[in-house]
């Protein structure tokens, strides 16, 4: 499916983007996101292309 462009997120990690919006969005260092299944059932989006970027929680 289509991979959305990433904009802003409220929590960032080296390779993960944790998004608070229904549409997956990451900080500007992340180029693309893909949804990852988790045991908790909470939506988790992994950054396919990641550039080092300081992101405050």
Swiss-Prot record:
The keyword Disulfide bond applies. Expressed in bulb (at protein level). The record marks 14-15 as: Reactive bond for trypsin. Keywords: Disulfide bond, Protease inhibitor, Serine protease inhibitor. The keyword Disulfide bond applies. One of its GO terms (cellular component) is extracellular region. GO terms for biological process: negative regulation of endopeptidase activity. GO terms for molecular function: serine-type endopeptidase inhibitor activity. InterPro entries: Bowman-Birk_prot_inh. Disulfide bonds join 6-55, 12-17, 26-33, 30-47. Serine protease inhibitor. Inhibits trypsin (Ki = 110 nM) and very weakly inhibits chymotrypsin (Ki =1200 nM). Does not inhibit bacterial subtilisin. Belongs to the Bowman-Birk serine protease inhibitor family. This is Bowman-Birk type proteinase inhibitor B4. It comes from Hyacinthus orientalis (Common hyacinth).
